[in-house]
């Protein structure tokens, strides 16, 4: 398993990261623990979670359960120093957390304490803001995104306020580093600039959706990541399961994400299935597993810190892990580029 230091930090992470958002709904605690064990055996040291997990569905009854499942594993195995744990502070509008309050110096200490308690640890390696207070163009909002109602002065004041609170947590030893999620190129540069101007932890990562099917980061965000030493953590690298091919031809496997979410968060479109067919053709042409090909491709990107993938079975996990050592030839990369040009932005 390849390792690298994340962003400008000294935190070393595997280039594949184990996602956890189904632990507590689609997966039991025991299944989540088995996934952690298998991933660590394969060389993964990086686990991503969030206070709002699990999903499918998100509910007041289950919020925080995924962190609790990870915490049970931490307490049982006493291997905390072998794992880099990342979690997230929910953003404005998440009614199940602090009645939907925006992220601020008033919410950060309590949110961190809650995560620490559930994770049964005294520190979080990477603490991320799940989405910006000012809004985001992620999750298909890019099609009608309008930032004209944003207030720059309020945004700057918020960043200064939040960074002050985060710095106090760093000094307390409760978090090691700070990351962002569902953030834009402008937002990344402003967080970095404010941190340098007023003090506070500079962001080392941004967790955004990124896959063969969703490449919004290829231009401005990628340039920002490279120049600001902010590594991308790609979520949904399999396009919520579309790139596995299991949904082609109208199939909806029992217990699958599509069976629980009929449009996969806006990803189910006729053009999406056409794009998947093109990528499946590339995999078949070169004798590759499509899951491993998609994950390995993400890992080749020059701004990538780690590729976050999830699984609902050990069989799925083992297939995904096979992509960690896969090297894609120039011919494969050229065919993937051609498929992308033929099927850009399918959702």
Question: What are these model-derived regions, one by one?
Answer:
Residues 6, 18, 32, 47, ...:
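Conserved, mostly hydrophobic/aromatic
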Residues 95-207:
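Glycine/proline-rich, positively charged
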Residues 170-171, 216-231:
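Basic phosphate/pyrophosphate-binding loop/patch that engages nucleotide-derived ligands
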Residues 14, 135-151, 224-282:
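Glycine-rich, positively charged active-site loop/lid region within alpha/beta enzyme cores that binds
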Residues 1-88, 106-109, 122, 171:
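N-terminal binding-site loop/beta-alpha segment at the start of enzyme catalytic domains
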Residues 42, 77-79, 118-123, 162-176, ...:
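A structural motif corresponding to the C-terminal end of an alpha-helix
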Residues 52, 170, 237, 257-325:
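Conserved short secondary-structure transition element at the edge of the structured enzyme core
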Residues 21-23, 52, 88-92, 129-132, ...:
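Active-site beta-loop-alpha junctions enriched in small/polar residues
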